[in-house]
Amino acid sequence: MVEFLELRGVEGATVLEIGGGVGEIQIELLKRGAARCVNLELSPAYDEEAKRLLREAALEDRAERRLHDIAAEPDGVEPADIVVLHRVVCCYPDYERLLGAAAQRARHLLVFSYPPRNVVSRLFVGAANLAFRLLRREYRSFAHPPSAMLGLLGERGLRRTFSYHTPVWRVAGLER
């Protein structure tokens, strides 16, 4: 993801990361010249570790962390040159609202990762969700249809110019 974005140009860019966790991608993009990063989370669970990592990298003045559901309230977020969603779409039930809001905020580039939709991933998601249900946890995982996700982004003016595959994850880089 970072390499794709760097090849397209991150110098002076604004970055919006949706579900960035502790912020490894944001820190890398800031180190490579991005001007500013905003990270949106649904939970404060990663905040302390993220703040520590930003402090250690001396980048805390160029990063902002917010609790915000962009799919529910897209207008509460400023557009950015680059939008990143790494291992997030699989955690959100309504990929159409999530990716639609992300596309709406992407001025130039959007990159996201997702699990392949095959027998293995569907079995894994089903087993994981059964375990979460038995443990009475609310979290659920999703293997959304890649062609539908990419089609939705295409309808919003983004075209795929990069793809990367591993056995467990797919990465799509799109440009406006």
Predicted regions and their residues:
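A short, conserved alpha-helix within the catalytic core of class I
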Residues: 92-102
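A short SAM/SAH-binding and catalytic strip from SAM-dependent methyltransferases
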Residues: 82-94
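Conserved class I S-adenosyl-L-methionine
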Residues: 13-21
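Short alpha-helix
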Residues: 139-156
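Short conserved loop adjoining the S-adenosyl-L-methionine
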Residues: 72-77
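Conserved alpha-helix/loop element of class I SAM-dependent methyltransferases that forms part
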Residues: 1-11
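Class I SAM-dependent methyltransferase SAM/SAH-binding core
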Residues: 22-69
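Conserved beta-strand signature within the Rossmann-like core of class I S-adenosyl-L-methionine
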Residues: 107-116
